Amino acid sequence: MRYLIAYLFVLSACSDGIKTLPSSTGILSEVIFVVEDMLWENQVKDVAFRTFGVPILGLTQDESSFRVIQVNHSEFKSILKTHKNIVIISKNVPTSNQQNKWANGQLVVQLEFKDDDNELIKDLNKVKAIFEFREIKILRNSISKSSQKTQEKLIKEQFNIETLIPSEYTIIKDTVALFWATYNPEKQEEIKHLFVFSFEPKAINLQQEVLQKTDSIFAKYLLGAKHGQHVKIEDMFSPVYSENTYRGLWKLNGGFMGGPFLIKTYFIDKKVVVTVGLIFAPNNRKRKYIKTFEAIL
């Protein structure tokens, strides 16, 4: 009995030492910078906004990649320590990163400050890329829990790509040539479309051909209420291309609707597979929609 009591005491002591971390707070599009006020104002602030605060390409209004929040070390306590995204910048500390440091679902990056703008820009761009990749991964994992698995399997068979179809979308067309799904609730001023199609490239300028093919899909399937109205790529703002991704704006020809779109392309068996996400949400900021398209397409 004496040994049993001693064993239970040791077991209890071990259990008491285990800390259960709280869930992380804040949103994925925010980053808290923990930097002393003088260092922030004189040397870090401008670089932080030139990296994390840069506007998302392909939108009519400025929406930053991340919302930047700064606090000094003495203010960094309580709920701020449980935020999802934290960057700590100090002098004479080793650079490191740690997941779930003070909360589950958290990433904390610590940077050693170097009195060199170019080095700081390089470091913060690397950190930003990590947070962007992490955000897309988290969004994709979250959406995949309730996405339309049967439909995704068919798209995989037809086009040989892995895309996600969120549960709220209604399938309009599903053939070997074209997949089309839409989200258009009656009581919300919000419309989303997803397209997947492929073609054999023939033009010398592939980027132009991708946009022309996409424009023809818009003109054929996305029609307005009046005769002759259809969606088209906005000519006044040239789409931005980078790493198989196109970001641009669409408008309703002969109407007043418009918004952003995102295209991703893949080279599969001598064909170009095109995935498109398009959003109309005049009353909302567009960042969350674009990030979701990045995650699912």
Regions found by a protein language model. Give the residues of each.
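Surface-exposed amphipathic alpha-helical segments
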Residues: 118-138, 163, 169, 274-297
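Secretory pathway targeting signatures of secreted, lumenal, and periplasmic proteins
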Residues: 17-19, 25, 32-38, 166-221, ...
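Signature of long, low-cysteine stretches enriched in small and polar/charged residues
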Residues: 19, 69-113, 219-274, 284-287
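N-terminal "mature-domain start" segment
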Residues: 26, 41, 144-173
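C-terminal motif of bacterial Sec signal peptides marking the signal peptidase cleavage site
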Residues: 12-13
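Start-of-domain marker
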Residues: 17-105, 115, 119
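Sec-dependent signal peptide recognition
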Residues: 1-7
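Surface-exposed, polar helix/loop patches in the mature regions of secreted/periplasmic/lumenal proteins
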Residues: 90-146
